[in-house]
């Protein structure tokens, strides 16, 4: 019961205080707005621009319907966010990319042995937040492969929770 969600990422050239957006001066940030929208930002790394994107925008698609180009609606949502919350970042658009999240219903990972086959391990989908957990997930998966188990409690990530739905 996974769903594919289209995500659009944007990089901007801030209109002022550009040094404040450099990775040495700014952390990654997450924004949970009162209207339910979520955004995240990342500082300028390697002079690629200040990155801004919505997190879980709810545009579910099929794998055959993925439009890899950003559009005016995508850009407008992010520009409006910048105008209200980080106006000095709301400069020239440098680049945009489209990627996908593969979401479970509860937006959590699957890290488990395949039912009825202890020789197969399912690791993911990560529902849009797996990358930052890569070292821990890698450690856990290597323990599952080598030791056929881990000391970490993986009950929250069991595939069985999704099979009940």
Q: Which residues fall in each region the model found?
A:
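Active-site substrate-recognition segment that forms the wall
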Residues: 1-119
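C-terminal catalytic lobe of FAD-dependent flavoproteins
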Residues: 80-165
């Amino acid at each position: 019961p996974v769903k594919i969600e289209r995500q659009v990422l944007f990089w901007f050239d801030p209109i002022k205080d550009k040094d404040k957006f450099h990775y040495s001066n700014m952390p990654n940030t997450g924004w949970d707005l009162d209207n339910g929208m979520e955004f995240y930002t990342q500082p300028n790394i390697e002079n690629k621009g200040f990155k801004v994107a919505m997190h879980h925008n709810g545009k579910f698609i099929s794998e055959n319907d993925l439009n890899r180009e950003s559009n005016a609606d995508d850009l407008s949502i992010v520009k409006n966010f910048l105008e209200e919350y980080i106006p000095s970042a709301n400069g020239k658009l440098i680049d945009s990319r489209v990627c996908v999240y593969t979401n479970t219903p509860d937006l959590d990972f699957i890290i488990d042995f395949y039912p009825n086959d202890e020789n197969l391990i399912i690791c993911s989908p990560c529902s849009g937040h797996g990358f930052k957990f890569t070292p821990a997930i890698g450690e856990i998966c290597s323990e599952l492969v080598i030791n056929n188990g881990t000391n970490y409690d993986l009950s929250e990530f069991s595939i069985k929770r999704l099979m009940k739905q």
